[in-house]
Each structure stands twice: as structure tokens, then as C-alpha cells.
């Protein structure tokens, strides 16, 4: 066994991977983590909701508060015959640790814990507070997870100063990318009403597909905004269109369209809703439209947290990191409501949600070292 596969972070990552915590089942991961943190003086609060396990852990009672956030749940393994080794039996081969959750994001959680253990052992009287916010409902509908903890904290006026979400953000090598924000996500379910009829007698019917087509073309052609330094322009995409009975001689009576905005911080959800309705109304459509806002955009500028994490990456692995807001949503969108500086950082994401998910062995302990250096920078009087 190599040094990379015998360290404390590797060992804890394997313990977590071996628990088949398919969302929303925590499978005892939070209890394992709490048992590691209890001797360090952490206080624990379970904020479980509707079968979802949520843990808030904090050491210290003063500011600044540095929180590590993440999720213990994983996506289903998929067809087992596609895996070269059982997905919940951590396996080492070819310089990689394989298993469901290895990259997304049990190695990050293990790295949080071991970084905290070393930091507290060396600096038991550090300034401020260390916190962990963990959930088993990130890969699912995410309505009973992190958002419930944030609501509880906000309800008693508790705020965070810095938060690192351990999502796998690196692209080619550990440390090359920090996510310092995410676009918002606004979805719509549109039902265009027509009149069903026989295709041979279109004058006796109203085809909702034909009526919607010009509006679709206009919506698809709109440049919603120009983006900004950190965000690309807002996009509008149709994901599903459904109409008809399956017969080729029946004009459908309704057409259902599912679409999604991924929007930059320069646009608001209300503005996008209003502009969409203007287009639909201008085309004279008879319609119903239901909206779902699953996440507002958030952005962390080049402040103390970005600087501390970037320096930690450079000092540990010699990589000059880049800031990015690309990709989907994360639980950072909830945490941003109670924290001004939220970033995501973790291992390479090339295999997440795939068969044979893995993390590089030689990235595991360095990831923990990066988190520890970030603690040093933000919770020691002189930042060292």
C-alpha cells in the first residue's frame, strides 16, 4: 500500500464510500463524522426533515465563522455490470480510488474532517468558529436538506462569514478551478390550449403546436442579457415538448412545454418571468404557465475567502487557480442567504455520476492540506 492510500483522509473516505448512502439515505455517515468531531469540542444539532438527515456542527461561539458544507448522499450506482468493481466497495487501482461518491463528494468530507482534526490539535485556541453543514438531500430534490438548516440558522439570526462547499470543482488537476458563484435556475411548465380535431378539418380545430411555434422561435432568439465579468449571458432552453395522442390524424388539444433559464446575476427571476409573459401574450396564446425557482444566482468576489483558498492551493500543489461560475446549481445557493462569501472547491469532477467514479490517490491528502491552510489563513490571528 502506498503512502497516498494509507493516510487518515484516505481511510475516512473509504469508510464513507463503503456506506451506500443513495439519496436521501445517509446510511450512518453523519453519525460517523460526529463521532470524529465530538472529541474536538464540537456542538451538534440535527435538523432532520421528512426522512432527510441534516447535521449542523460548530466549535466556538465567536466570529469569524468558517463553515465547510457538503452532502453525504450519492446518486444511484446504475447498472452494476458497468462497474469494474462494486460501487460501494472502495477499490484502489491505477493510482485511483474507485467507488460511488469518491469524487462527489465523500473525499471532500473526509478532507474537511482530517483538516479540522489537525488544525484543532495544533491550534486549540484559534479565533472564531469552525462549522460543518452536512445533508443527505443534495442529489435529490434538495427541499429538505441544506435549505432547512439555513432556515433554522436564519431564524435565530446566526450568520456565517465564510463557507467552502466541497463540490468537485477541479477540471484537469486538483486546484485548477474554484467556483465562486453559480447561475440561477428558473423553470417553467407551459400549457398552450387549442381545440382538438381531425387533421382533415383544421378549420374546425386550433393547433396549439402551430400557435406556439412563432413564440418559440422568438423566445429562442432573445438575448436576455450580456452577462458580466463572472457570468456568461443568461440562456433559455426548451427541455421537453409534448402534444398529441400518438395518432397521426388528430390535431392535439394542448401542447405542454418545459423550459429553463440559467440566469446571470445581472437579471432577476421576476424580470425573466415578466419578459416571457410579454412574448406569449403578444402572440395571442391561450395558456397557463407555472414557474419554479430552484436557485437564485450568487457570486463571491475576490475577498478574503477566495484569496485564502487560492493561496492554499498555490502553496500546497503549486497551481494557479481560476475562478468560474459554470455548471449547474449547488447548495451554495441556499447558504449564500446567510453568508457573504461562499465558494466551492474539491477534487477533479471528470467521473462524477458515472460508472467507475474515482478520485486520484495523490490528490486526497493534498485536498485536506488545502482545507487546513485555509483554516490557518482565516482563523489564526496572523493567518499562519
Curated annotation (Swiss-Prot):
Binds 2 Zn(2+) or Co(2+) ions per subunit. It catalyses: N-succinyl-(2S,6S)-2,6-diaminopimelate + H2O = (2S,6S)-2,6-diaminopimelate + succinate. The active site is at residues 73, 138. It is an enzyme of class 3 (hydrolase). GO terms for biological process: diaminopimelate biosynthetic process; L-arginine biosynthetic process; lysine biosynthetic process via diaminopimelate. Pathway: Amino-acid biosynthesis; L-lysine biosynthesis via DAP pathway; LL-2,6-diaminopimelate from (S)-tetrahydrodipicolinate (succinylase route): step 3/3. Zn(2+) 1 binds at residues 71, 104, 167. Zn(2+) 2 binds at residues 104, 139, 353. Signal peptide: none annotated. Keywords: Amino-acid biosynthesis, Cobalt, Diaminopimelate biosynthesis, Hydrolase, Lysine biosynthesis, Metal-binding, Zinc. Its cofactor is Zn(2+); Co(2+). Catalyzes the hydrolysis of N-succinyl-L,L-diaminopimelic acid (SDAP), forming succinate and LL-2,6-diaminopimelate (DAP), an intermediate involved in the bacterial biosynthesis of lysine and meso-diaminopimelic acid, an essential component of bacterial cell walls. NCBIfam families: dapE_proteo, PRK13009.1. This is Succinyl-diaminopimelate desuccinylase. It comes from Aromatoleum aromaticum (strain DSM 19018 / LMG 30748 / EbN1) (Azoarcus sp. (strain EbN1)). The lineage of its organism: Bacteria, Pseudomonadati, Pseudomonadota, Betaproteobacteria, Rhodocyclales. The gene is dapE.
Amino acid at each position: 500500500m502506498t503512502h497516498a492510500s494509507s493516510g487518515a483522509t484516505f481511510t475516512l473516505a473509504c469508510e464513507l464510500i463503503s456506506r451506500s448512502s443513495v439519496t436521501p439515505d445517509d446510511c450512518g455517515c453523519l453519525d460517523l463524522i460526529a463521532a470524529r468531531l465530538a472529541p474536538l469540542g464540537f456542538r451538534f444539532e440535527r435538523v432532520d426533515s421528512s426522512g432527510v438527515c441534516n447535521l449542523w456542527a460548530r466549535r466556538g461561539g465567536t466570529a469569524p465563522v468558517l463553515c465547510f458544507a457538503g452532502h453525504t448522499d450519492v446518486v444511484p450506482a446504475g447498472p452494476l455490470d458497468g462497474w469494474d468493481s462494486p460501487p460501494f466497495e472502495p477499490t484502489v487501482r491505477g493510482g485511483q480510488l474507485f467507488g460511488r461518491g469518491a469524487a462527489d463528494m465523500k473525499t471532500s468530507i473526509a478532507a474537511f474532517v482530517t483538516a479540522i482534526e489537525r488544525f484543532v490539535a495544533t491550534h486549540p485556541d484559534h479565533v472564531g468558529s469552525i462549522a460543518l453543514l452536512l445533508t443527505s438531500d443534495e442529489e435529490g430534490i434538495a427541499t429538505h436538506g441544506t435549505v432547512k438548516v439555513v432556515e433554522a440558522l436564519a431564524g435565530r439570526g446566526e450568520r456565517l462569514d465564510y463557507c467552502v462547499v466541497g463540490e468537485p470543482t477541479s477540471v484537469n488537476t486538483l486546484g485548477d478551478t474554484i467556483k465562486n458563484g453559480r447561475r440561477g435556475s428558473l423553470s417553467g411548465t407551459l400549457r398552450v390550449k387549442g381545440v382538438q380535431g381531425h387533421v382533415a378539418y383544421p378549420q374546425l380545430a386550433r393547433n396549439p403546436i402551430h400557435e406556439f411555434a412563432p413564440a418559440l422561435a422568438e423566445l429562442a432568439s432573445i438575448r436576455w442579457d450580456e452577462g458580466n465579468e463572472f457570468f456568461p449571458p443568461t440562456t433559455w432552453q426548451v427541455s421537453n415538448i409534448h402534444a398529441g395522442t400518438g395518432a397521426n390524424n388528430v390535431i392535439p388539444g394542448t401542447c405542454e412545454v418545459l423550459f429553463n433559464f440559467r440566469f446571470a446575476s445581472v437579471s432577476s427571476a421576476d424580470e425573466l418571468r415578466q419578459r416571457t409573459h410579454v412574448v406569449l401574450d403578444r402572440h395571442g396564446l391561450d395558456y397557463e404557465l407555472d414557474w419554479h425557482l430552484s436557485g437564485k444566482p450568487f457570486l463571491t468576489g475576490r475577498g478574503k475567502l477566495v484569496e485564502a483558498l487560492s493561496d492554499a492551493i498555490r502553496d500546497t500543489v503549486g497551481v494557479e487557480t481560476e475562478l468560474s461560475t459554470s455548471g449547474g446549481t449547488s447548495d451554495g445557493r441556499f447558504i449564500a442567504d446567510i453568508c457573504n462569501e461562499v465558494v466551492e472547491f474539491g477534487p477533479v469532477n471528470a467521473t462524477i455520476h458515472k460508472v467507475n467514479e474515482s478520485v486520484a490517490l495523490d490528490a486526497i491528502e493534498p485536498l485536506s492540506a488545502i482545507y487546513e491552510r485555509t483554516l490557518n489563513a482565516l482563523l489564526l490571528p496572523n493567518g499562519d
